[in-house]
Amino acid sequence: MSNHPKITSAHQNVEEKLRELQERFCHLQAARKEGRHGDLALLEAQISQNIREWQAELTAPSPESSLLGEGISQFLEEFAPLLKLDEEDDATSTLKEHAGAKPDPEGFSQSLCPPEWTSENFSQSPFNGNFSCGFEDALNSTETHGQQLHYGYEGFDPSINSAPDFHDQKLSSNLDITSQYDYIFSEVRQELDNSPSTKLDSSEEIDNFAEFSTPSSVRVPPSAFLGPKCALWDCTRPAQGSEWYLDYCSNYHGTLALNEDSPGTAPVLRPGGISLKDNLLIDALRAKTQGKNVGIPVCEGAVNTKCPWNAAELFHLELVEGETIREWLFFDKPRRAYDSGNRKQRSLPDYSGRGWHESRKQLMKEQEGQKRSYYMDPQPPGPFEWHLFEYQINESDACALYRLELKVGNGKKSPKGKISKDPLADLQKKMGQFKVASDKPSPPTKGRKE
């Protein structure tokens, strides 16, 4: 076995990067199954960044690459484009430039490595959910290779059982980024099958296979859901983090909560409405009062200093096609006009109407909180209707959670007061009752006898 310190360091670096990449893929798989589209976008960006950093390290000169000579440099130059995720279209990217007009599969695989390496096969298992990366000794080729490192990725899409044909398959230009990940990694596996392995040996024997299973944040026992939940406001998974993200289900959600409620952030926007029950919003408010980051920003005076339709920097009002409701979430200090249980109103300086008018107060005994509902009185001209919901908890009045709702109405806005459909009919009815009462014979009176 080689005791070269730089090779040992390189081996550990590769192991850590593979471990991190595998964990992010597990989170990506879980987010895809649970339909968390916001999480998918951020995870895809993180995976893309990790791969670009890895690509930069591969192409950077190092003592190990200089020892291996020009062969490995040529291999890395051919391998680096496979890690590029920012190509506009795979069908027109530089991946096809190596094949020529009529690509020959055998010739293409031979061009990736020197002739003296072509007889050596890269140890690779079928891509059925587990992939392995073999590292052999490049400096001491006569010594025996240690135990292979197997990195099993159980969370990967099992439908990918074989690599697509690199030369014949054509990708459409509207592939989503997750499909491009699957395709690119399948191509990498196919090219590594036809190329030599980079021989880097560890200085110590590995007792057990370094097999990765789905992280505990993806698979949890049912009893864990009865304990504390993830502090991210729209996540219902249990909090099973470690180190700095103890209050979250994963380090990804911890980072997401920290980024999305940072100062200066616009309110949380949800086209189509917020499909969460009120108890989860109360939980988010309670976690905020406990000093946790929940992914909802603080926006002081967002709906009290001016009308929401005049605050374009906070509330984006361009609805998408077919959208009938849009909601925003943010924290703010409770206003004095909302403290009383009586129905009150709060005027707005840029609106001639009465402003926000309280319509309902709901006590949430199980959650030890309350919810107040407001409507804009009167509603502004046009098809839009504005509603505001305020959530508070009994143990703290430091802040309140506000949910602002924009709803597309049917154009028929009726006043909130109860008005009779036909006032004339009511008047005639009352007059009829009075007439009947007046027609009744009066009791006889006794006259004085003369």
Curated annotation (Swiss-Prot):
Region listing for VOZ, in residue ranges: 221-418
Effect of loss of the gene: No visible phenotype. Voz1 and voz2 double mutant displays a late flowering phenotype under long-day conditions.
Tissue: Ubiquitous. Expressed in the vascular bundles and mesophyll cells of various tissues. Expressed in the root, especially in the root tip. Also detected in stamen filaments, stipules and anthers.
Superkingdom: Eukaryota
Entry comment on modification after translation: Phosphorylated.
Mutation effect (C230A): Reduces DNA-binding ability
Expression induction or repression: By far-red light. Down-regulated by far-red light (at protein level).
Family matches, as InterPro entries: VOZ1/VOZ2
UniProt keywords, alphabetically: Activator, Cytoplasm, DNA-binding, Metal-binding, Nucleus, Phosphoprotein, Phytochrome signaling pathway, Transcription, Transcription regulation, Zinc, Zinc-finger
Cellular compartments per GO CC: cytoplasm; nucleus
Compositionally skewed regions (Basic and acidic residues) per UniProt: 95-105, 355-371, 419-429
Stretch list, region Disordered: 91-115, 339-374, 411-450
Subcellular location: Cytoplasm; Nucleus
GO annotation (BP), single: response to salt stress
Subunit structure: Homodimer. Interacts with phytochrome B (phyB).
Identification of the protein by name: Transcription factor VOZ2
Upper classification of the organism: Eukaryota, Viridiplantae, Streptophyta, Embryophyta, Tracheophyta
Gene name as annotated: VOZ2
